[in-house]
Amino acid sequence: MEKAENEKKPSAVSDVGAWAMNVTSSVGIIMANKQLMSSSGFGFSFATTLTGFHFALTALVGMVSNATGLSASKHVPLWELLWFSLVANISIAAMNFSLMLNSVGFYQISKLSMIPVVCVMEWVLHSKHYSREVKASVMVVVVGVGICTVTDVKVNAKGFICACTAVFSTSLQQISIGSLQKKYSIGSFELLSKTAPIQAISLLIFGPFVDYFLSGRFISTYKMTYSAMLCILLSCALAVFCNISQYLCIGRFSATSFQVLGHMKTVCVLTLGWLIFDSEMTFKNIAGMVLAVVGMVIYSWAVELEKQRKSKVIPHGKHSMTEDEIKLLKEGIEHMDLKDMELGNNKA
């Protein structure tokens, strides 16, 4: 009994570590990118090319990791990697278009809508069902973050199409990460190492043209300064941790859990934006933050309640012992797969 509890503690600690890394790096990169791309900052308005830089550094880290033996390379069909990279790149480009063509309020609403979209996709693709408590907690989080972020909503046809494309492709991308990991028994960082070079090459080739369409300027016309270069390097470093932690989180948790818990980052961004960039903070923002946090607490309780209900279901009949043995065998295999996915345990 004590041995089982001791085995759960490292897993719980690594789960918290992966989530903390994701929140810190995700919030940090938003702050760095805002300073880098805003007109009051360095005016580097080439978001798609910048994302190419991010994946180029991530690919380099993956190559070094494979060369030094920190991670093993497993085979994944090239067509699956190309398909996933295409979906991921469409997601990034559509998000940039959505942010450009829509108000910040509508852009945030489109991000919130990924939660129900992921739920529907997991229901359709994986026949996954959710309890009433989980559904209610998702609604509380959506309402809370919606109140917190939405100020004005100005919808136009092009922006709406881009937002819908971004929501669908990003939701599909997040579900695909978990599916590929399970299908090929591949670790999160190993999968990232395989897709990052493809995404880097494609974004660096087509990114400048996308950015020209968005801003009317080519990156070659930008006057680079030492401070701007340092900010770009900081952004790239944070992107590496953000990408790694995103794969770790989705590998450990379901895509829906990642989406719901991910809106904690929105609250952090709004708070830091208010403190650092003097963004407006109204009573509605504060009330939304509180409601979102309450929703996340309810969500945690609902998930634990659902686990307890499933654990109390004891199979009856003459084949019950065989089913128990199969269940234990499956849990052992899944436990081994999880250890393989834990990047921190590779060379700890």
Curated annotation (Swiss-Prot):
Q: What's in the GO CC field?
A: Golgi apparatus; Golgi membrane
Keywords of the record: Antiport, Golgi apparatus, Membrane, Sugar transport, Transmembrane, Transmembrane helix, Transport
Q: Which GO terms describe its molecular function?
A: antiporter activity; transmembrane transporter activity
Any phenotype upon disruption?
Answer: No visible phenotype. Lower content of seed mucilage.
Which Cys residues form disulphide pairs? none
The positions making up the signal sequence are: none
Spans through the membrane: 12-32, 44-64, 81-101, 104-124, 133-153, 160-180, 196-216, 230-250, 257-277, 286-306
Q: Spell out the Pfam families in the cross-references.
A: TPT (PF03151)
Q: How does it sit in the membrane?
A: Multi-pass membrane protein
GO biological process terms, alphabetically, are: mucilage biosynthetic process involved in seed coat development
Q: Where in the cell is it found?
A: Golgi apparatus membrane
**Annotated family:** Belongs to the TPT transporter family. TPT (TC 2.A.7.9) subfamily.
Q: What does this protein do?
A: Nucleotide-sugar transporter that transports UDP-rhamnose or UDP-galactose and UMP in a strict counter-exchange mode.
Please give the name of this protein: UDP-rhamnose/UDP-galactose transporter 2
- Its source organism is Arabidopsis thaliana
Gene that produces this protein: URGT2
